[in-house]
UniProtKB/Swiss-Prot annotation:
Monomer. This is tRNA-2-methylthio-N(6)-dimethylallyladenosine synthase. Its main location: cytoplasm. SMART domains: Elp3 (SM00729). Binds 2 [4Fe-4S] clusters. One cluster is coordinated with 3 cysteines and an exchangeable S-adenosyl-L-methionine. It comes from Synechococcus sp. (strain JA-2-3B'a(2-13)) (Cyanobacteria bacterium Yellowstone B-Prime). Catalyzes the methylthiolation of N6-(dimethylallyl)adenosine (i(6)A), leading to the formation of 2-methylthio-N6-(dimethylallyl)adenosine (ms(2)i(6)A) at position 37 in tRNAs that read codons beginning with uridine. The lineage of its organism: Bacteria, Bacillati, Cyanobacteriota, Cyanophyceae, Synechococcales.
Length: 444
């Protein structure tokens, strides 16, 4: 008898992608086998995101197709996980009665138990707040070179535009020993890089007893043999301390790339967003980073068209992008999320104005990023090879310590997992092309 098959699709952030990897690992421990054909899979799992309305609508579109399959073949298992599941709960069952399981992000490690309830004939909704348990099941990781490691779940912030605290719950930090054990495990499996993940990763440890912090965690895991690079995301400016910056500068494995969302360049907008910092404080953080690590790459997130944002306030965002010189900015037009204060405010910015501002911001981001990339022309950059260039299989693809994508001629299979010095011969806003100088052998 053939093993049952499963198919997953992930919407949203790195946290969701890491959660999907963990759920895939649980499914495989239960005997399921991955398939690329969602219309033939015995179990279909959508890991969802509520940050943008378009992502939510895509989920319902996919669910409509799967619901038709389920009506013809009731044995198919249909699961919605993640933030839409947490937000909608039983409403999802009323909208899509064919669903077997609706589970919030806090239940990722409990998927096996929830499936057992489904197998017993139950339709299950798991959205009540729970403590997130450690899970000994190994994730089915998408990459063979770089691994995501969750270190803190949830968020205690109360930004007026954001639904995340409602759907992901309060902060729950993992114990340092458990995090190090997982990193040691991926190192033994041949991984060369880890990215420590959290909604506000620099808030790590304040809920533990005894309290600790991200700087201490970085020092604790830095000595794991086999790991060549350590990254972390996403950081909140409120908790990005000088101690954290100096620790990153001192530890050679920590990459000189920091993702720190600023969201807006206007203090008035930041205040209404309830972000808890000013643009002056944000600039001070970047200045400190570049004081200790002059070549550090900085990426961020920004929102345009927040309720009440004037053209003059938007110009402050453009000025911040110009002044900082970001390597990348993930931009978005404000999207009202049900249940958030900002969604109820009367001074919503018209859609056409949001679209215009987004286009102008994107043009500037590309210009600034292109100038940052151009500085690397002729330099030799250390590139961790992740695999082949999807558009040209004769080229290897990897990332610099500053997280720039690099393409160069070479055997991707042979070089995968290797740290290769590459001389940069051409630059674009968000990627580089180069030539291998020498090859440093892969790890043991």
């Amino acid at each position: 008898m053939a093993a049952p098959t499963y198919y997953t699709i992930t919407f949203g952030c790195q946290m969701n992608r890491a959660d999907t990897e963990r759920m895939a690992g649980i499914l495989e421990s239960l005997g399921y086998v991955a398939t690329e054909d969602e219309l033939q899979a015995d179990l279909v799992l959508y890991n969802t995101c509520t940050i943008r309305d378009n992502a939510e609508q895509k989920v319902y579109s996919y669910l409509g197709i799967q619901a038709q399959r389920k009506r013809k073949n009731p044995a198919i298992k249909l699961i919605v996980a993640g933030c839409v599941a947490q937000q909608e709960g039983e409403k999802l069952l009323r909208r899509v009665p064919e669903l077997d399981l609706v589970m919030g992000p806090q239940y990722v490690n409990r998927l096996g138990d929830l499936l057992a309830q489904v197998e017993a004939g139950n339709q299950v909704v798991a959205t009540d707040p729970v403590e997130i348990p450690e899970d000994i099941t190994k994730p089915r990781r998408d990459s063979q070179v770089t691994a995501w490691i969750n270190v803190i779940y949830g968020c205690n912030e109360r930004c007026t535009y954001c639904i995340v605290p409602r759907v992901r719950g309060q902060e729950q930090s993992r114990q340092p020993q458990a995090i190090r054990a997982e990193i040691e495990d991926v190192a033994r499996a041949g991984y060369r890089e880890v990215t420590l993940l959290g909604q506000n990763i620099d808030a790590y440890g304040r809920d533990l007893d005894p309290k600790t912090n991200l700087a201490s965690l970085l020092r604790f895991v830095h000595s794991v043999e086999g790991i060549e690079r350590i990254r972390f995301a996403t950081s909140h400016p409120r908790y990005f301390t000088e101690e954290l910056i100096t620790t990153c500068a001192e530890l050679p494995k920590v990459c000189e790339h920091f993702h720190i969302p600023f969201q807006a360049g206007s203090n008035e907008v930041l205040k209404r967003m309830r972000r808890g910092y000013t643009h002056e404080r944000y600039r001070q953080i970047i200045q400190l980073i570049r004081q200790y690590m002059p070549e550090a790459a900085i990426s961020a997130d920004a929102i345009v068209g927040f309720p009440g944002e004037t053209e003059a306030q938007f110009q402050e965002t453009l000025q911040l992008v110009q002044d900082i010189g970001f390597d990348q900015v993930n931009t978005a037009a404000y999207s009202p999320r049900p249940g958030t204060p900002a969604a109820e405010w009367p001074d919503q910015v018209p859609e056409e104005e949001k679209s215009d501002r987004l286009q102008r911001l994107n043009r500037l981001v590309a210009e600034v990023a292109a100038a940052r990339s151009a500085r690397l022309l002729g330099q030799v950059q250390e590139v961790l090879v992740e695999g082949p260039n999807p558009k040209n299989p004769r080229q290897a693809m990897g990332r610099t310590r500053g997280n720039r994508l690099v393409f160069f001629e070479g055997d991707p299979e042979e070089l995968q997992g290797s740290l290769v010095p590459v001389r940069i011969t051409a630059t674009r806003a968000f990627s580089l092309t180069g030539e291998a100088v020498t090859v440093r052998a892969s790890g043991p």
